[in-house]
Amino acid sequence: MSKDLDKEDVLYKKRHSIAHVMAEAVRDLFPNTKIAIGPPIKDGFYYDFEFKKQITEDSLLDIENRMREILKTGSSFEKELISVEQALEIFKDEPYKIDLIKNFDLQNEISIYKSHNFIDLCRGPHVDNMNKIDPKAFKLTSIAGAYWRGNEKNTMLTRIYGTLWNNEKELRSYLNLREEIKKRDHRKLGKELDLFSIHEEIGPGLVFFHPNGAKIRALIEDFWREEHSKNGYDILFTPHIGKSWLWQTSGHLDFYKDSMFEKMEMDKSDYYLKPMNCPFHIAIYNTGKHSYRDLPFRWAELGTVYRYEKIGALHGIMRARGFTQDDAHIICTHSQVLDEIKEVLRFAIYMWSKFGFNSLKAYLSTKPDKFVGNDSDWEMSLKVLEEALSGFEVPYEIDKGGGAFYGPKIDLKIVDSLEREWQMSTIQFDFNLPERFNMTYTAEDGKEKRPFMIHRALLGSIERFFGILIEHYGGAFPLWLSPIQAVIIPVNNAVEDYAIKVFNKFKNEGMRIKLDNTSSRMNAKIREYQAKKIPYMFIIGEREAKEEKISIRTRTNEQINGLELDEALKLILLKIRDKEI
């Protein structure tokens, strides 16, 4: 369950309750339907069904109307505790409920909820009665496929999604936001703006960057490398595959194998595509001996990794099988840890601001029940993370017990223009890999000690970050990131020589600029380039040619007439240099 959901929250209870109402409505309209599960989720609810005959979204309105009829009864939601034997009898015609019940302890009682003419296997909680739900405050939004228990080997069920709010005004506000999200979907804009494609026949989850998208990606990566070099990082390059002993030693084959691609056999050895970069960076560290005087090492890599994501989990470039991780590892001594964490936080905040993200949230994850390392290292590292966070104006919450077994961490989330949170940066202590790979350094007292290792990502994966940027800006990238920054449009052939002069002047200064001297009508050209979200159109008429000026039309339809050519160049280059948003 998303940690954004609080079971005691009234909206959570309403959404849980309306899911039961939906299941009853579906059963009334489609009597032979088998019912699976239906929880509340962030922004709404869903329920999974096995229909005898597949339904379409045309059926959603009928289901909504039946739901409103049920709500009018004002029926109560009543909890009852029963034995496993009773549950098996009640749900004997519901195979998915039976599958769940068989996993329960026979000695324990099972919780069910009754409402109107419906009984469901459920822990709750729910509202007291249906009068608490505004019948105008919900809507069924979509239909999707979902495997039972998320396993591709199981039956494909039909999942009906819905949303519910406290009142109709909140619902309308959410639906308007949802429409805007659809318009900005990175998969839709990726095709319209010719940024990337995914070819199922070649391989699901594998991203092809087209020239426009590749240009933006290159700009992001160039900026990343430049800033990392400025901030004391050394850039690494490591292979894409490694022998099985490496992944055995790291623990990936024990704990992460289901997310790895199958092994490849070559030269009497087994190789795996790398799911992470960490063991390769450690291999570089272990090529020599190190003194405390050498530390800290700050090693960063844009390393392509491969993870076997289930088909149903893939989502454009946001969730892919091959992607480039913005990875870094800081290897340091005990006394250096606090300064290094503070510096990573400062760096993360700076990087996000350059891409237009100034609203951040942080989550500090503490020690889980099962962990490696000693208590003193955990306590020290948690104090360091908390002290580092307290020095920045970033609100944070404690995620008690949410740390990985190998160390505590800070997760940084950004908030986009559609008010959605995205988990991006991670700062993670690791007490596991230094032990597994026997990483050491010679301390000041001459003894061999274990260094502290901090995993750190700022952008996450380049592909996912690119997808977030597309949706955040609706495809209208900032000037410095736009694949084409301006188009020159001469109004007729008589001014073409001057248009070429303007083109060469801007191009020679490094601008990504295009000259359109085709015979199409000017208004059609302007509409085309605004649709392509190109920041500037330079309109060259006879007056501009005579006075050596340009008139600028922006993608948002603003107009600046008669700007001196050199002044325009100076202003635009300044915006690009400063990475103005």
UniProtKB/Swiss-Prot annotation:
Residues 185-478 are annotated as: Catalytic. It is found in: Cytoplasm. GO terms for molecular function: ATP binding; metal ion binding; threonine-tRNA ligase activity; tRNA binding. It comes from the Bacteria. Its cofactor is Zn(2+). Catalyzes the attachment of threonine to tRNA(Thr) in a two-step reaction: L-threonine is first activated by ATP to form Thr-AMP and then transferred to the acceptor end of tRNA(Thr). Also edits incorrectly charged L-seryl-tRNA(Thr). This is Threonine--tRNA ligase.
